[in-house]
A protein has these predicted regions:
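Positively charged n-region of N-terminal signal peptides that target proteins for export
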Residues: 1-4
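Structural beta-strand segments of beta-rich domains
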Residues: 36-40
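Solvent-exposed serine/threonine-rich low-complexity stretches and specific carbohydrate-binding patches
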Residues: 63-78
């Protein structure tokens, strides 16, 4: 074998066979002596299947960084049984490559059922319906950090395995919650999501928006900085006929994104967003902790937050004359990820969610695990009101149940359900805090709202409202 500057010994080539349902058999490798091009052949049975490939030397993956120049029937849904090929031109040296005496190259080809989607989905926004799948972030061709496309022209989504996981959403006990004027809106209650979903690894960037053919003014311009000053109406459309669960306006951000990818992207629901922001469930992922499992130690400047997020404590520089200059947002991915692998869930920009915002007392009905109020939240569903009717036709509190027309009255006496569009045009929820927020407003459990359309008044002049997208796995 040979690549640029390297000579490999063909006799050391081997191939592994990984059986699954569907199955892959007869994996072969060969290399063209002149071009150095490697051809990986395999036989697929039980199509359709999502096929992924990994290249290993000495039993260790070389990583996606070295697989940028790879093409063929992999990382996508393969619909036909039989022989398939993958072509790879290895043009970068890796750690083991120069040691020809010990060198041993292996291709591991995996096939998964079409309904068992891999953890990483990548949509190439430059082309129609160009969607790829990978086993993990480390498998991304060219490398997540080495290849700027993943934050400019491609959209990287990570699967959140939350189906049937019961967890406690909200908090009234952690630092930054107790004593806030709106702390009751964080009142703890149990939630169970009924579907897994993909969520953007990063906040949606300005370059990604431009790739969709859309432009808007940003407070802090930069290709890999997050979109800011983003109105809910720009995301979905301003007419009530475009409110969830209807399809968005074709000319909106989500309308353009759906048309380009063929996938039903949307904003995350609050429950989807918070589950991911908490870093999952379990020890160190509940009250009083950031999404990376470190404790919240302050409502103002928390060192555990400044280590993982662009926030007020690190978003300003002091000039020689004593004045301050705002650095604003950071390039997405500038700080470490949380425990589920997501970046900038705290700080940078506040992130829009689908849900309606009804003020500081949304949870005044004391929804707590102790009173048996367990909620099944359909992934992607938002604000169904469950409770006793009051004068303004609003329930006393919200459960994330199922926002669909004609949702029936509850079996319990005095219980009422209605969809979120009781309040068309109302404020929508934001989550996560921004570059200009203290620790109390960056907590995974903090909730607040902002006008669906207004982006040019008040704090929005500072460029604090952005978004990331979600995709429910049906």
């Amino acid at each position: 074998m040979k690549t640029r500057g390297l000579v490999f010994v063909v006799a050391f080539l081997t191939a592994s066979v990984v059986l699954a349902t569907p199955s892959v058999e007869n994996v072969t490798l060969s290399q063209d002596a002149e071009s150095g091009e490697v051809t990986i052949g395999y036989e697929l049975a039980g199509a359709p299947a999502i096929v992924t490939v990994d290249i290993q030397t000495n039993g260790v993956s070389i990583g996606g960084k070295y697989l940028k120049r790879m093409s063929g029937d992999f990382s996508k849904l393969v619909t036909v049984d039989g022989h398939h090929e993958i072509v790879w031109l290895p043009d970068l040296p890796w750690a083991d490559a120069a040691d020809t005496a010990a060198f041993n190259l292996r291709a591991e080809v995996l096939a998964a059922a079409a309904d068992d989607l891999p953890d990483i989905l990548v949509a190439d926004l430059r082309f129609k319906n160009e969607v790829s799948y990978y086993a993990n972030v480390e498998s991304l061709p060219g490398g997540l950090w080495e290849n700027p496309e993943y934050r400019t022209t491609k959209l990287v989504m990570k699967r959140v395995r939350a189906k049937n996981v019961t967890w406690t959403r909200g908090s009234s006990q952690e630092p930054g919650a107790v004593g806030l004027s709106n702390f009751r809106c964080e009142e703890a209650h149990e939630v169970t999501l009924d579907k897994d979903y993909y969520l953007g690894l990063f906040e949606f960037t300005q370059a990604q928006l431009q790739t969709l053919g859309l432009t808007t003014a940003h407070a802090f311009p930069g290709a890999m900085r997050p979109c800011d000053k983003i109105a809910y109406t720009f995301l979905r459309g301003s007419d009530a006929k475009y409110y969830w669960p209807a399809d968005p306006d074709p000319n909106s951000i989500l309308g353009k994104l759906r048309a380009q990818t063929g996938l039903k992207f949307d904003m995350p629901s609050e429950s989807q967003w918070e589950f991911a922001a908490r870093g999952g469930v379990g020890e160190n992922h509940g009250d009083g902790y950031w999404g990376d499992g470190t404790p919240i130690t302050s409502t103002g400047t928390c060192p555990n937050l400044t280590a993982q997020a662009r926030c007020k404590a690190n978003a300003y520089v002091t000039n020689e004359d004593g004045s301050e200059t705002a650095l604003g947002t950071a390039v997405v991915g500038s700080y470490p990820p949380n425990s589920l692998g997501f970046y900038d869930m705290a700080g940078n920009v506040r992130e829009r969610c689908l849900d309606f915002w009804q003020g500081a007392n949304d949870y005044s009905g004391a929804i707590t695990p102790s009173n048996g109020k367990n909620v099944t939240a359909l992934a992607g569903a938002v604000n169904v009101y469950q409770g006793e009717l009051v004068g303004d036709n609003r329930g006393k509190y919200i459960h994330e149940v199922c926002n669909k027309e004609g949702y029936p009255n509850g079996a319990d006496s005095g219980t009422y359900y209605h969809v979120g569009d009781l309040f068309p045009g109302g404020d929508r929820v934001w989550r996560g805090g921004c570059w200009d927020d203290n620790a109390s407003n960056c907590r995974p459990r903090v909730r607040n709202g902002w006008s669906a359309g207004g982006i040019t008044t008040g704090s929005n002049l500072n460029g604090d409202i952005g978004f990331r997208v979600a995709l429910t796995i049906e």
